[in-house]
């Protein structure tokens, strides 16, 4: 079967440790407190910074602690249109303005939001990548649930108490600009993880990959492989139910949750 292939070598390594040395910190909403539940709290955008390994910029927002005589600085995912010196309001009674943080239950239907909480108090999990946004579709006052459309197109029912930032995540259109040079890809993935460059299996020799070898680059066997194949052969489309392009009239697959 030849050498130990790339997939086997990856499995034998240590547990992946993220490249976080130069990162600025975790982008989260404020920890929910009495001020946000019943009124609002005012903060000011001190700085908009780049975070290595992340497409979207981050906003440093300074809040006055409602319980102690000190200031707290939070890192928010920056919404498009915010600027340094802008006041940001967080809470149930905050106004519906770009950059403010409100519960989705208080927002009108059709509102564009980002950094949405999946569960109340988890400080933002959905629609956080650059240019992404979710849309508030409908409210159910009886069950206190809100339906939102996620960037993938799927629709999700979440609690109306979940908070979100009003607006679209900044940095949209980032992937429209082509990388053009290998050097740019090198620096991009150096900040993220060791997954570049990736040599294709058909470009290898037969000892290095099941798809390697031949007088021209071709797989020479089915690209699908059974689930219980040995590790050195388990490459390609593993236990694929189907292959090929999805054809038909259905463009957005709506998942009902």
Swiss-Prot record:
- Segments carrying the region annotation (Disordered) are 207-231
PROSITE patterns xrefs:
RIBOSOMAL_L2
Cytoplasm recorded as keyword: yes
Q: Which GO terms describe its biological process?
A: cytoplasmic translation
Question: What keywords sit in the KW lines?
Answer: Cytoplasm, Ribonucleoprotein, Ribosomal protein, RNA-binding, rRNA-binding
A Pfam family it matches: Ribosomal_L2
Q: What does this protein do?
A: Component of the large ribosomal subunit. The ribosome is a large ribonucleoprotein complex responsible for the synthesis of proteins in the cell.
This protein's assembly is summarised as: Component of the large ribosomal subunit.
Write down what this protein is called: Large ribosomal subunit protein uL2
Q: Which organism is it from?
A: Xenopus laevis
């Amino acid at each position: 079967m030849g050498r130990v292939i790339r997939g086997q070598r990856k499995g034998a390594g240590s547990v992946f440790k993220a490249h976080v040395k130069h990162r600025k910190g975790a982008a989260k909403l404020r920890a929910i407190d009495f001020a946000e539940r019943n009124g609002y709290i005012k903060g000011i955008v001190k700085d908009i910074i780049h975070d290595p390994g992340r497409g979207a910029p981050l906003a440093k927002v300074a809040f006055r602690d409602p319980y102690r005589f000190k200031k707290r600085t939070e890192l928010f995912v920056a919404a498009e249109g915010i600027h340094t010196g802008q006041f940001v309001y967080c809470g149930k009674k905050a106004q519906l303005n770009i950059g403010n943080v409100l519960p989705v239950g208080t927002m009108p239907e059709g509102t564009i939001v980002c950094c949405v909480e999946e569960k109340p108090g988890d400080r933002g999990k959905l629609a956080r990548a650059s240019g992404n946004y979710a849309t508030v579709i409908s409210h159910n006052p009886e069950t206190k649930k809100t339906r939102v459309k996620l960037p993938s197109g799927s629709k999700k029912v979440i609690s109306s108490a979940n908070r979100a930032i009003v607006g679209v995540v900044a940095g949209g259109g980032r992937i429209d600009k082509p990388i053009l040079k290998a050097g740019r890809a090198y620096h991009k993935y150096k900040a993220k993880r060791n997954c570049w460059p990736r040599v294709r299996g058909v470009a290898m020799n037969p000892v290095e990959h099941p798809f390697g070898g031949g007088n021209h680059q071709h797989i020479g066997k089915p690209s699908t492989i059974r689930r219980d194949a040995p590790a050195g052969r388990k490459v390609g489309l593993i236990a694929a139910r189907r292959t090929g392009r999805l054809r038909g009239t259905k463009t957005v697959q709506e998942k009902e949750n």
